[in-house]
């Protein structure tokens, strides 16, 4: 499966992305204030380049959302919102689960799912009246690894160590492998 299969959506401008980030921060703040007793999960995808959406990326996004809902099946979910802007898919969930426990579940999910590395599963709390993300390292988790070289992702991102083309190719390979495995297990389920 070629890269175009995954990156076939509409290209966006930097100004669109900046506006979307601002709107996301406002939405997060609103939800944290509206549900002060709950924990907020904000889900987006790590998709480099000007194309943030496509039918296949939406399929990946929805697979992860379903996995989140399954992981939280025993916990009270107070609110859910799924948005599909061209600037990248967004999902918000408020649960009664303490934020620390929610973050630990999301770290486990990111690790267990082969496509978990493509997601930002941010657990947010209010700090000085602003949304603040709980870091995986604060909870004893290791920093996220780069798709390409397995070094710390933040360092590679800050240094722009890899081109958009390299990252998209790595993501395409990951997704191709994921969907092929998924299709093989579906086929063997039917023949078994």
Curated annotation (Swiss-Prot):
Highest rank taxon of the organism: Bacteria
Pfam family, one: CitX
GO biological process: prosthetic group biosynthetic process
Keyword Nucleotidyltransferase on entry: yes
Keyword terms, alphabetized: Nucleotidyltransferase, Transferase
Enzymatic reactions: apo-[citrate lyase ACP] + 2'-(5''-triphospho-alpha-D-ribosyl)-3'-dephospho-CoA = holo-[citrate lyase ACP] + diphosphate
EC number: 2.7.7.61
Enzyme class, broadest EC rank: transferase
Gene Ontology MF term list: holo-citrate lyase synthase activity
Family: Belongs to the CitX family.
Protein name: Probable apo-citrate lyase phosphoribosyl-dephospho-CoA transferase
